Amino acid sequence: HFSSTAIDYSKFRPDYPPTLFDDLATRAPQRRLAWDCGCGGGQATRHLARLFDRVVATDPSAAQLATAPQFLNVTYDTAPAEHAPILQDHSVDLIVAAQAAHWFDLPRFYDEVRRVAAPNAVLALITYRPTQIVDPVANAVLQDFYTRTVSPYWPADRHHVETGYQSLDFPFPEEPGPDMKIEVQWDLEQVVGYAGTWSAVKEYRHRCGEDPLPILRRGLTSVWGAPDDKKTTFWPLSYRITRLP
């Protein structure tokens, strides 16, 4: 879904709060090895690298991995989340899938989780809900673009993001996650650039033969003020977290 927009993805995708990974690391039984599955351009990997002795980060997209930051203790591998032969049995202390699990074949992924998880390992599926702008007028334009203009072009599994993964199959006893959100100060073009990473925008271009982003840009320009004005933009975080046997 993301290979053809890998550079834009790494440029515009928002970063997670470091305290989220501090929280997850404190839950892990040890800090020897973390697995970031469906790592994309390494948005979560960079945080895990400072907290664990080793990190293995996997993604099926080589284009995405090519944009990921390099660390001495991180190994990147082109592999699907459902099959990570680079990982040994019962070796991983923390398994993270950040904004990725809704793409997985979950029964096969959970089988792989059970194979690689160390005793008492933690599994955390992280998602951020759809973008919100604090300015209500600008937010109304963005929500109209999301819910009307490109809504028909989202993959079916997108609804899992909108429910904060509560609709996702998760056959484990759960632990609550921290109450956090991603928050940035963005100008108009950053909001438009971020929207350009949406898989629905890519599918709109493919099926309609034109780019929908000018629709969003025109709408935001009419209400934004100076284009380089910064507006608070945020994504509420949601989780499914468990401790494995």
Place the predicted regions along the sequence by residue:
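Conserved acidic residues
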Residues: 32, 53, 93
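A short acidic, Gly/Pro-enriched loop at the edge of an enzyme's catalytic core
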Residues: 84-94
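Conserved catalytic/acceptor-binding region of the Class I
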Residues: 119-185
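Conserved Class I S-adenosyl-L-methionine
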Residues: 163-245
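Class I SAM-dependent methyltransferase SAM/SAH-binding core
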Residues: 35, 41-84
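A short glycine-rich, Lys/Arg-flanked "PGG" loop and its adjoining helix->strand segment in the class I
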Residues: 108-119
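Conserved class I S-adenosyl-L-methionine
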Residues: 1-30
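A short SAM/SAH-binding and catalytic strip from SAM-dependent methyltransferases
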Residues: 93-107
